[in-house]
């Protein structure tokens, strides 16, 4: 029997695998800060991450990603600042380059039942389970 927290942790793991798949196809993930990047890496994310705070404002960020021409997956936080940034960036990206239409952000909210507001909290929420999941997956492949 899987407990609710373990179920969410498993969904988060699948979410990370999905992001990895998108990035192998050329997408880039955008997060707000360095802690968000660290949390994704802790959970096994291997693709390219753009940290919004490393840019000097929305215009510089959008200019950079639009020149790049790659699909952008916005995973900014769900707090007031993150929602405002997401809205402004989304409006500008709509005109300039491909993006995920906030699919992954909506999926993030749905899978966590709205309990996790910041990407950086993902690793705190499910890291112990994710480590067990990875160990289990590795052991089961070794048996086959």
Question: Model-predicted segments: where are they?
Answer:
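Aromatic-enriched hydrophobic runs in primary sequence
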Residues: 15-19, 31, 37, 53, ...
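A short linear-motif detector with a strong N-terminal bias
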Residues: 7-10, 28-30, 51-54, 80
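TOPRIM fold recognition
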Residues: 2, 42-43, 48, 54, ...
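A general structural-boundary detector
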Residues: 26-27, 76
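Short, contiguous, helix-prone interaction/anchoring segments in small proteins
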Residues: 27-49
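Phosphate-handling DNA/RNA-contact segment within nucleic-acid enzymes
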Residues: 1-26, 34, 38, 60-61
